[in-house]
Amino acid sequence: ADSVQLIQMLFDGLMTCLADAEGHFERNDIKGKHESIGKATKILVGLQSALDFEEGKELAANLSDLYDYCVRRLLKANIRNDIDGIKEVRSLIQEVKGAWEMLPQILNKDVKVSMVS
């Protein structure tokens, strides 16, 4: 798997953890919710540590801020038993995940264009 695929796999895992956390919340499974949020937080930290600030500059900084916000929001949601926090993070991450899913198509187009020039 290349680096884009690895990042996509992290996003898939993150979305699964967030969905699991919501399910645990709805079933009043406090231990399960706590574990799922813990896993989601670790994945967010992993995504944040994979950012390339030299290459990505402003985009990397913005993603870092977003991941940091999501970690704080999940911790608050866990402490306050707030499903809306989990849903908010899930919605934010879904948008970023969607952009990563389009990246291979964009990269392939760039490669084809540069090969033609």
Give short role names for the model-derived ranges.
Residues 1-12, 17-117:
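C-terminal-biased regions
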